[in-house]
Amino acid sequence: MAFRPLVATAIFAASLAVSPALAQSSSPITGLDALREWNLVVLGNLESSSEVEGRTFVGGNLSGNSSNYAIRPLAQSTSGQPGLTVVGDVNGGHKNLNNGSGAVVGGNVNSGFNLNGAAQTVKVGGTISNTNVNQNKVLSGLGNSDPAFVVGLQQQKEQLVSSLDRLSFDMGTLTSNSQFAVQGNRGVFTAKPNADGLAVFEISSADLDKIGEIQFALNGAETVVVNVSGRNILLNDNFIGGTNNLGEHVIWNFPDAENIRVTTAWGGSILAPSADAETGNYIQGSAVFGNLKQNGEMHIGTYKGGNIGTPGGGSSSGGSSSGGDPVPIPEPGLWGLFALGVGGLIYARRFRRRRDG
């Protein structure tokens, strides 16, 4: 039988067909590094009529009225991330991409983009409509011409979902070492950081409901985690002294949250990977939601704090671990090679049957 030669031929043909982009892969951005990279991460769908000052990642579809992205000039991403990444489709009103930030879209751009500022690069897996190219570089149909394009985006989403779920869970198991006290209508958070600069608070949604003001004393803490239990969360408190770039060091973790509503300007990064959220005012910091209806701005002051080790193993302000390690997922290049190899094998076997018949 010629079965083995056919397999070898198919795999060899597949290896020749694989593009360099398919055969290579960069290190995934996961865990706390995702909060450092993106101003807003929505693992599912984002409906927006507002704006994001930094970078945005959407794991599902982007819809809603006209919205704005990367409205503040940003240093170039060391990992090459554009101002806007959407794994699914872009629908609704025109989306404004600013400061030459560019976009990557796995599906179709039905709404159209306004490409403002310096020349931008837009990569689209499907079709793009209602967009004036001018001096910009707009590539569409990449889902057909490069199989790795859409596969890579889907795997990027899967790794973010896995690692951010794990990060929220791990943070939720950290032992509290700092003091929360209610003083009249005010909740006072007094950080008592450990040797690694980590301060941890543990409160409930009921505790938040009892107060109308929030005050922080960070006391030199590099990383502050506020674990909040409860499924339904209302964030309607005022921050004494303003939001004050709290999001660079403070993470509000909602590991149990299913619904979150933000009605006041919120200080601190938010980690709620399973929550359906709605914002009516700005958040200063990074934010992670399951799905989001956005009517309030996202302000930079994204997370810059230290890393958090696994519970029981201490914490780290540096090092290689950023917390929330994802469940391993095969690299896009391996999937592409496997798929092309199988396709070549099937074709070869069918050709042999036709020849022998």
Language model regions located:
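Hydrophobic alpha-helical segments and helix pairs
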Residues: N114-S168
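Sec/Tat signal peptide C-region and signal peptidase I cleavage site
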Residues: V18-A23
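A short, hydrophobic C-terminal helix/tail in secreted or cell-surface proteins
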Residues: P330-A348
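Long, polar low-complexity repeats
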Residues: Q24-S101, G106-F113, Q159-T310
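C-terminal membrane-anchoring or membrane-association module
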Residues: L345-G357
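Ser/Thr/Gly/Pro-rich low-complexity, disordered linker/stalk segments of secreted
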Residues: I308-P326
